[in-house]
Structures are given as structure tokens and as C-alpha cells.
From Swiss-Prot:
Name of the protein: Guanylate kinase
Entry keywords, A to Z: ATP-binding, Cytoplasm, Kinase, Nucleotide-binding, Transferase
NCBIfam families (UniProt xref): guanyl_kin (TIGR03263)
EC number per UniProt: 2.7.4.8
Listed GO MF terms: ATP binding; guanylate kinase activity
Pfam families registered for this protein in UniProt: Guanylate_kin
The keyword Iron-sulfur appears for this protein: no
The organism of origin for this protein: Syntrophotalea carbinolica (strain DSM 2380 / NBRC 103641 / GraBd1) (Pelobacter carbinolicus)
Binding-site residues, ATP: A12, P13, S14, G15, A16, G17, K18, T19
Any one annotated GO CC term: cytosol
Superkingdom to which the source organism belongs: Bacteria
Length: 210
């Protein structure tokens, strides 16, 4: 049954395993698209422009902000990240679900403007495990890790307004929980009510007795 595309907004502290989780979900749902954010962050080893991020200069990013090109944008860990408005509009119109992993600042902007979309927060099993994962990457200095841990405490406080919470202690289990959320939201009556009315030639205005 046809419906508009759903935006699944995913946030998590750095090191919670959000990227691994999202990659598996996109593999499971081939019709789902993973939105690629714009960033001023330097490209890391193994990252590809246009695949992991759209890497742009601060000057280009500022121009896009001034032109209203972003549905949301935020400064995180000293770098800017943003989601192109055109990407969201295109996915909705085509009925394509979109997976968007962004920080809490950007998610809050979208929550105010798109309250009917789905907001999911990913947690590590403990703060100690989060620190272990960050140190195990061997990509950040001690100063950067300390800043990420400090930011994590603030970010976790934001989970109260998210729709769902997944604790990523065991990745296969977290994937199953994520998959269940996607399937359930796709079947939500409010999303497919108008299409059901069209198929059965029924006025689906809320005339129920409940």
C-alpha cells in the first residue's frame, strides 16, 4: 500500500555503534535510503566523499546555510554538519523511507518541524563501555576523547523526547529491535489511511465513534 516516505532520525553519543547499526539496516531494507550529510569535518582514512559524507569547506557550508539549503544543521565537536532539504523532500514525494543519523541539535530542529517522523536514540550499555569503544578506535587524541565523553553526558539527557530507545549492547539484537520499529511505523494507520480510502472508495475522515 502506497504512503509517503518516512524519515527515521537516529541519534547517539559518539561510540554507541550508530554507524554499524545503520549500515545493517540499509542492507536489510534495500528500498530504504541512507541520507548523506554535508560536513566541514576533515575526511578520515577509508572515507569516501559522497558515500560517507559530502565533505565541503567551511565557506561552502556557510553559503548553503545562507541560501536555506539545509533542513537542519549544527556545529558538533567543532565541525559543521547539515542535511540537505532537497534530499528530504525528494524522499517523501517518492514514498522512499530515509535513514538520517544526526546529532541531537539537528534532530531537535527536525522534531519541531517534522513531529510525525520517527526519532530513535541509540545508547551504549554503559558509560564505561562507551569510553572503551572510543579508545579502541585509535583515531582520536586523549583530548578529543575527553570532549566526546563530556558531550555524551549532555546528549544522553536529550533522549527523553525521542520516540524510541535502543540499547546497543549486542548488535544483532539491536538490529532486530530497529527492524521492528521500521516495520511497525510503516503499518501505522495514520500513514496509510488515505490510501486505504482510495482503494476502497471510502471517505476516511475521522468519523469513528471511538
Amino acid at each position: 500500500m502506497k504512503r509517503n516516505g518516512i524519515l527515521f532520525v537516529i541519534s547517539a553519543p559518539s561510540g554507541a555503534g550508530k554507524t554499524s547499526l545503520c549500515r545493517q539496516i540499509v542492507d536489510i531494507f534495500p528500498d530504504m535510503r541512507h541520507s548523506i550529510s554535508f560536513t566541514t569535518r576533515p575526511r578520515r582514512n577509508g572515507e569516501t566523499d559522497g558515500v560517507d559524507y559530502h565533505f565541503v569547506t567551511p565557506e561552502v557550508f556557510d553559503t548553503m546555510v545562507a541560501e536555506g539549503a539545509f533542513a537542519e544543521w549544527a556545529r558538533v565537536h567543532g565541525n559543521c554538519y547539515g542535511t540537505a532539504l532537497a534530499t528530504l523532500q525528494e524522499a517523501r514525494e517518492q514514498g522512499q523511507d530515509l535513514l538520517l543519523d544526526i546529532d541531537c541539535q539537528g534532530a531537535a530542529q527536525l522534531k519541531r518541524n517534522c513531529p510525525d517522523d520517527v526519532f530513535i536514540f541509540i545508547l551504549p550499555p554503559s558509560f564505561e563501555e562507551l569510553e572503551r569503544r572510543l579508545r579502541g578506535r585509535n583515531t582520536d587524541t586523549a583530548e578529543v576523547i575527553a570532549r566526546r565523553l563530556d558531550n555524551a553526558r549532555r546528549e544522553i539527557r536529550e533522549l527523553v523526547w525521542y520516540d524510541y530507545l535502543i540499547v546497543n549492547e549486542d548488535l544483532p539484537r539491536a538490529v532486530e529491535e530497529f527492524k521492528s520499529i521500521i516495520l511497525a511505523e510503516g503499518c501505522r494507520a495514520s500513514r496509510i489511511r488515505s490510501e486505504a480510502g482510495r482503494l476502497f472508495d471510502i471517505d476516511m475522515q475521522d468519523n469513528s465513534t471511538i
